[in-house]
């Protein structure tokens, strides 16, 4: 206490920077030169440097807390003044903000304290010759119009610890991180001073994963809160679950700077890394020497560290680690970190296996089990994507499918003393409406999540509940990576050219026809389709058979010659196009026979206009061949005998609904098979 203007002012030392803001302006001005704390660390022969140029005649010293003092948000009853300020909904973060502000120049500190969002400060950037910046969740804020000088940087450097090989330092027994930028002469010309926080309850969003005992990989961009999350995970495992937790703290960011770890990690032990290039050695040493049940690792970034993490996982130790990247897909594409998800290898499949999977013969597969059992993608400090099984997610991504995940958010409510964790079901997620796209813009955004040869993804159409074929007006088709001429020529061959019309405007289209070869890793076309309520037809190739099936399904026909079947738009299930092969598992002889028909039609009959005689087959296989020929609407003759039947495919259009080998009919000229005019052929 001291007398000011004949009044008594009681000062709260623990939050002097906050109290001074609540006083009247005259009192704050008179007290500003004396209320700042003097947190300094002494290492070796380092001398204490005054934080401001105050005159020699100073008031009597005020008793201050020790350098390592910090209040624990999990024990609100320990300090009545802190409890009185605590919000009833969320626990305030542990921030030694006095110690952080002390390293700043006096003028910068004075201006920064006046900011209304000082409690949400993220970091302060000081570059030589530039204005100092303060970064808040709302954006950057210029602290002072005066540029940073060499003296300002030297003052800040003198109040922090020694910088490590990666140019990082900190304040003793605090979580703040100070990173330096040096010139060619190794002189400090810039500082990034990041505020470290212990946010109690930040790990509640993934409590089920923590209690499950599996290894957790936390992925996110810099500054999204990965370190804060794993620090709270370490405390929960050590204090609540009574596990032996060892933290491999490379940059002293998890446990704070200095030899005594910060209280924010609870009972967990902390191992410092003398050389950042030897982090993998310290990881192995922690397992061999200290018998941990859980190891916490921050920033796995090299192949050696990834290999060490994989080794630790095979020894039965739970791992919790972070890695830089927006999604798991970034980890898969990072050659140094691929081992964390099991590694990637190229596999060549046999013909039968490739047909069974309906994929090409050379594919990418996961090499082995992933190091981590689950993964958390940090979207923001209050939202994340959770992958319960990392192996399933990786397999889905490699197969070109949509990876299963769950989105979780932290939502605060007034009547609840803690933050609520609210899982959001995937089916209830609403995608952002996408803008109306033109053809050039769509070409940059399309993706493919399916591995079927032909898959229809339908959504409700506002204009009508159903559509049938034939229609009074033609179906407008928007094509992507499918030649309009090919589609129109196929429709003309089928005699349906009056029922299909190609358009370049998505807004006028009734359906979208796209090639799956261009639909990779992006769902923008699906958002466009959902916005306009359009069904999407995805064909894997632009072969004759695929185009014919596309036209049939676009017009709502189950098969040629049958009555049109309406496609109910209100249905929530996707319509999957059946393969040409039979539903039962075919034999190798059947596969060879069907492949013989396909090759004959697509490479000889249609392009060259020549008939092709097939090899003799069993009667049941002949039936399968006839069904396949019918899908191309071509005529066929039976040239064999009853005991040795064989077919000949003719380059003429079939007019029969069905054709069987037991009931051939003669044409007007006496030849076997059906008659029809010669068809125009598709271009090669």
Swiss-Prot record:
Residue ranges, annotated region (Disordered): 33-91, 651-684
Residues the record lists as binding ATP: 220-227
Keyword annotations: ATP-binding, Chloroplast, Developmental protein, Membrane, Nucleotide-binding, Plastid, Transit peptide
Known role: Required during eoplast (a highly reduced plastid type present during the degreening and dehydration stages of seed maturation) development in embryos and early stages of eoplast redifferentiation during seedling growth.
Disruption phenotype: Albino seedlings with defects in etioplast and amyloplast development leading to degenerate organelle-like structures, but normal green vegetative tissues. Reduced hypocotyl gravitropism probably due to the lack of amyloplasts.
Organism of derivation: Arabidopsis thaliana (Mouse-ear cress)
Gene Ontology MF: a single term: ATP hydrolysis activity
Protein name, UniProt field: Protein SEEDLING PLASTID DEVELOPMENT 1
Subcellular location: Plastid, Chloroplast membrane; Plastid, Chloroplast envelope
Organelle transit peptide: 1-78
């Amino acid at each position: 206490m001291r007398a000011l203007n004949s009044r008594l002012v009681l000062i709260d030392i623990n939050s002097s920077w906050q109290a001074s803001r609540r006083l009247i302006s005259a009192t704050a001005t008179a007290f500003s030169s004396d209320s700042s704390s003097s947190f300094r660390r002494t290492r070796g022969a380092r001398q204490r440097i005054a934080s401001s140029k105050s005159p020699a005649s100073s008031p009597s010293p005020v008793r201050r807390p020790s350098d390592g003092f910090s209040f624990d948000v999990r024990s609100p009853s320990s300090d009545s003044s802190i409890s009185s300020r605590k919000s009833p909904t969320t626990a305030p973060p542990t921030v030694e903000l006095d110690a952080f502000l002390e390293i700043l120049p006096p003028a910068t500190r004075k201006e920064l304290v006046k900011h209304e969002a000082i409690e949400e400060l993220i970091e302060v950037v000081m570059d030589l010759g530039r204005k100092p910046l303060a970064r808040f969740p709302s954006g950057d804020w210029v602290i002072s119009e005066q540029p940073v000088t060499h003296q300002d940087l030297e003052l800040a450097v003198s109040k922090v610890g020694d910088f490590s090989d990666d140019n990082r330092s900190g304040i003793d027994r605090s979580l703040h991180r100070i990173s330096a930028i040096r010139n060619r002469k190794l002189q400090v010309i810039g500082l990034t001073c990041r505020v470290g926080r212990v946010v109690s309850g930040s790990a509640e969003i993934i409590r089920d994963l923590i209690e499950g005992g599996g290894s957790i990989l936390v992925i996110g961009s810099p500054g999204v809160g990965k370190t804060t999350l794993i620090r709270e995970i370490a405390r929960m495992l050590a204090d609540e679950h009574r596990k032996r937790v060892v933290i491999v703290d490379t940059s002293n960011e998890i446990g704070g700077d200095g030899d005594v770890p910060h209280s924010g990690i609870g009972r967990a032990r902390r191992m410092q890394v003398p050389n950042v290039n030897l982090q993998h050695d310290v990881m192995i040493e922690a397992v061999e020497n200290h018998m941990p049940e859980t190891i916490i690792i921050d920033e796995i970034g090299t192949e050696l560290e990834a290999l060490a993490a994989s080794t630790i996982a095979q020894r039965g130790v739970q791992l919790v680690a972070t890695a830089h990247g927006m999604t798991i897909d970034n980890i898969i594409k990072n050659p140094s970190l691929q081992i964390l998800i099991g590694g990637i290898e190229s596999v060549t499949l046999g013909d039968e296996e490739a047909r069974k999977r309906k994929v090409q013969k050379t594919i990418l597969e996961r090499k082995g089990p992933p190091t981590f059992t689950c993964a958390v993608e940090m979207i923001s400090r209050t939202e994340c994507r959770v992958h319960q099984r990392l192996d399933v997610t990786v397999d889905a991504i490699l197969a070109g499918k949509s990876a299963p995940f769950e989105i979780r958010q932290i939502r605060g409510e007034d009547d609840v003393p803690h933050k609520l964790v609210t899982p959001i079901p995937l089916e209830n997620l609403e995608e952002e409406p996408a803008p109306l796209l033109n053809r050039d813009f769509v070409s940059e955004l399309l993706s493919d999540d399916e591995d079927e040869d032909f898959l229809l993804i339908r959504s409700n159409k506002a204009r009508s509940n159903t559509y049938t074929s034939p229609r009074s007006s033609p179906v407008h088709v928007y094509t992507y990576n499918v030649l309009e001429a090919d589609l129109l020529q196929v429709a003309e061959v089928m005699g349906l050219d009056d029922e299909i019309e190609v358009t370049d405007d998505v807004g006028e289209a009734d359906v979208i026809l796209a090639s799956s070869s261009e639909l990779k890793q992006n769902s923008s076309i699906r958002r466009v389709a959902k916005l306009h309520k359009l069904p999407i037809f995805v064909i894997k190739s632009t072969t004759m058979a695929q185009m014919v099936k596309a036209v049939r399904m676009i017009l709502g026909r189950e098969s040629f010659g049958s009555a049109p079947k309406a496609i109910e738009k209100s249905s929530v299930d996707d319509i999957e196009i059946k393969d040409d092969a039979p539903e039962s598992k075919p034999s190798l002889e059947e596969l060879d026979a069907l492949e013989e028909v396909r090759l004959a039609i697509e490479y000889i009959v249609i392009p060259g206009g020549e008939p092709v005689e097939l090899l003799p087959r069993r009667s049941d296989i002949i039936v399968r061949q006839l069904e396949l020929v019918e899908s191309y609407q071509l005529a066929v003759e039976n040239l064999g005998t009853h005991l040795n039947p064989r077919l000949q495919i003719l380059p003429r259009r079939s007019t029969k609904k069905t054709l069987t080998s037991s009931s051939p009919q003669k044409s007007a000229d006496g030849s076997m098979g059906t008659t029809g005019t010669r068809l125009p052929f598709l271009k090669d």
